[in-house]
Amino acid sequence: MSGSALFICPQGNNVLSADLEWCVPTLANARRAKSLKPTGLKLLRSPDLTRIPWLVHAFTTRPGGFTTSYGRRTLNVGFTKDDLRASVERNRKQVLLATGAVTRGTQWPLVTLRQVHSDIIHVVRSRKPDKLVGDGVVTDLPRLALGILTADCFPVLLVDTKKKAVGAFHAGWRGTVKRIVEKGVGIMRLEFGSRPEDIHAAIGPGIQKCSFEVGEEVEDAFHTQFDYADELFHNVQESDAVRERYPMLFMNQRAPGHGDPCIKLHLDLREANRRQLLAAGMPEANITALADCTVCQPRRFFSHRAERGKTGRQMALVGIQ
């Protein structure tokens, strides 16, 4: 059971195919666990990171879990107020099994954060860290899974192929303005001796520029930080779209086509994070990004914006075997 997703390598505008994988790699493990049965979950993997033999990584999607508050059999991995905690824990266990984050039948510890849209990054040196507050986490410990939760914000995974170190980052617009992924590369250089040319990045599913309408305060914030900010914002004309869909609402108004066009300001948050990675010294060829939009595909992804805040969470997971 597989489909395909598009990962973009910005160099030369190449488009790479990334498999949507059912939990076949550890199907036997799932069958042995009485509380778990394979449910058709689908995981996204970067084709670039997949070539690293000692790496475990995945971006989860919406279908194929045990939670039910946001649809039948969904893979919500966030502890929201609507889904049962036990069901979310079963989903997380299923993801660890499916990605191979298990050694001799024992699941790896999963490190997550209480995310606060910050630039706080933690270096994990223990398999049982204290409760962490922030939006980035890095480690060089093997058999430890790092997880970032998202539902429109971009998850970014960093992997140093030489030093065997990994990082996971939550990049919403606020964290992006604070340069969280650029700082993540810096932390890996300081803590592990990483070189930017040895680091590979995968930007996971998030809200693409087609859907990310923002206000002037967001534009102003980016302009205070980045000299290329103009290249990240786009004016989108939305003229008469509602009239065309609901013509009866405008029986006594001006005919379609005669009103002033509605200009909306949209932000390319994915590109903003890609530019930060380049600014940190990473080669363009080492950066891949998922092209799919979480807002445009609510059946495939949880989306805070599309579902007006009442939704689950995806997880971006990375670890060292």
Q: Residues of each region from the PLM?
A:
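Active-site microenvironment for binding and transforming phosphate-containing groups
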Residues: S2-Q321
